[in-house]
Amino acid sequence: MRSPLLAPSEKCQAWPRFTPPWYLSSGLAMTLYTAFVANQRCLNSARTREPEYISQVMTGSQGVPLHVWRSPIPSQAKGTLIATYGITGSLEDQGFLRQWGRWAYERHYDVILFDWRAHGKTAELSPTLTSDGLYEGEDFVYLAAQAKALGYPGPFWFGGYSLGGQLSLWGVYKGQTLADWGNNDAMLTSFSPTDIGGAMAICPSLDSQRSLNYLTSHPVGRYLEKAIANKLKELAWQLHRHHPGEFDSQAIERANTIWGFDHNLVIDRLGLASVEDYYEVSSALPLLSKIVKPTLLLYAADDPMFHPAIVEELPGLQNQLTGVDLQITPKGGHVGYIANGPCQQASNDPDENWAIHRTLDWLDQKSLA
C-alpha cells in the first residue's frame, strides 16, 4: 500500500515513480553527486542545445537592475518560463537551470533566466542584497511585465529550485496580490494577475530557521553549511569590489556562516531586528495555503538540506492547499533527481534529469487545461 506521505496530490495526476541509480540511493550521495558531477554534465549538454539567449538588463522591484537571458520568441509559443537558481551561483555555472531552460524551449515555451539580487552579473550592476523572496517575488512580476511588453506570450510561469524555489513561491504570491503593492507603477499598468499562469518550485526552502538549525547540528550538515557560507562570503567580497564604499569589510570578515551573512550584511538593510525575524517573515511555508494560482511543489523526503520534520508535516497541509500541487518523492536528494536507466526509459525521458521532465509535463498539462 502506498504510504500517505507519498500519495500524489489530488490536483495532479500520479507521476511515474522516480528511481535513482543504486549508488545515489541516499539523499546525501545524490546531493553531492549533483553538485560535483551532474551540474557540469548538465552545463555541457545545455551549451550545445539551448536557445541563443539575448543578454539584457531589465528592472526589478525598487528599480533594481537585473541581468537576464531571454530566448528568441518561438512561433506558437505556449507561454513563458521565468526562472532562477538557488542560494549561490550565476547563469554561467548553473547547469540544472540551463537544462531546464533548454528543454522548456524545445517544448515551445519562451524562456527568461535571470541572475537574482546580489548574484552573477546582477551583483555587478547593483549593491542591493538578497531578501529571500520579500522583494525577489516582486522581481518575478516586474520581469514578466517587461517580457509581455517585449511581445513574450502569456501565461507567465515562475520557476526556481532550492532557495530559488522559495523565490518563485513568493513570485506567484506577489503576482496574485499585485493590486496590494503595485502602487500604480507605470511599468505594471499593462500587466495583471491574469497574465500569470503559476509557478514551479523544485526542492524549495520552506523554513530557513528550522533547516539551518538542523544543518548546523550534524557533522555532515555543518560541512554543507560551511561550503555554502564560504560561497556567500565570496559573493560579499565581489559586491565589495564592484561597489566600493557600500559594504563594511569588517562585517564581511564576520560573515563566516549563513546566519552570520544575514546578521552582518542583510537584516539592517531590510529594517529587521534579528535574523530570526528575517527568516520568519521570508518563510515560504505560510504562503502555501495562500497561493491560488496553479503551483507545483516537488520535494524529496531524503533531502539532506532541510529539517526532516518539514516533509512529515507537508501532507497534513493538503486540505489547506487550493493552488499548490504537492508532490513528495521518497528519493531525489537536494535538486538531484538523477534517474537510472530503467526509470528514464519508463518515463520516456530524453535524459536522466527526471525532475526537469516531470515539471515540464506538469506545465504542459496546465497549459492544455
Swiss-Prot record:
State the family named in the UniProt similarity comment for this chain.
Belongs to the AB hydrolase superfamily. AB hydrolase 4 family.
Q: Give the organism, scientific name.
A: Synechocystis sp. (strain ATCC 27184 / PCC 6803 / Kazusa)
Identify the InterPro entries for this entry: AB_hydrolase_1, AB_hydrolase_4_CS, AB_hydrolase_4_sf, AB_hydrolase_fold, ABHD4
Q: List the Gene3D superfamilies.
A: alpha/beta hydrolase
Keyword Nucleotidyltransferase present in the record's keywords: the answer is no
Which Gene Ontology molecular-function terms are recorded?
monoacylglycerol lipase activity; short-chain carboxylesterase activity
Question: Which SUPFAM superfamilies does the record match to this protein?
Answer: alpha/beta-Hydrolases
For this UniProt record, the keywords arranged alphabetically read as follows: Hydrolase, Serine esterase
Put simply, this protein is called Putative esterase slr0264
The membrane spanning regions, by residue number, are none
Write down the EC number. 3.1.1.-
Q: Name its GO BP terms in alphabetical order.
A: lipid metabolic process
